[in-house]
Amino acid sequence: DHDRAQAMYERAIDADPTDADNLGNYAIFLKNVRHEYDQAKAMYERAIEANPNHANTLGNYSQLLFATGRDKTAIALVTRALPLAGTDEKPLVAECRFYLFAHSPEHRRESGENLRDLLAAGVTTGSWSFEPNLERLRREKDPRYDLVRDVADALSSGDTQTLESRGEWYAL
């Protein structure tokens, strides 16, 4: 029940208004479940204020910013998140690299190479959704949409067969 979940997030934040994990998780809920992007933005900003070095929050907030076309700010956040991600946070690194691959021409080649290495090492992001990013590329009629969608699918499933059949994946 989404209403009960929201009430629980709000109680947790009332109990500790500076807990970056609670603020960031509530922002994810607002973005992914409620589709309340302005409120999610406010929660992400509170979470970053509470802990400016919280790699997961920086990465998640960058998705919202990239999906809504605020690339310059998103690039700043995601490039901050990458060196902060721990060695055990390879899925987070893959997520951040995906956003740069999808939305930043300046970072595309390096991020594509990193994604190839991560996928070859068996790193996946599981059920994490890249749909907001794919929707933006669809809306903009980006010619790389099919490739980026295949990268998202490979990150979710670990199956790189479709991706490996794409010449442009290796031509990065």
Predicted features and spans:
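Residues in the short coil linking paired helices within alpha-helical repeat scaffolds
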Residues: 1, 35-36, 70, 104-107
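Register position in tetratricopeptide repeats
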Residues: 32-33, 67-68, 99-103
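Short coil/turn linkers that connect adjacent helices within long alpha-helical scaffolds
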Residues: 13, 48, 87-89
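Conserved small-residue packing positions in alpha-helical repeats and bundles
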Residues: 27-28, 62, 94-103, 132-136, ...
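Conserved alpha-helical positions within TPR/SEL1-like repeat arrays
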Residues: 21-31, 56-63, 90-96
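Alpha-helical repeat scaffolds
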Residues: 5-9, 39-46, 72-84, 107-122, ...
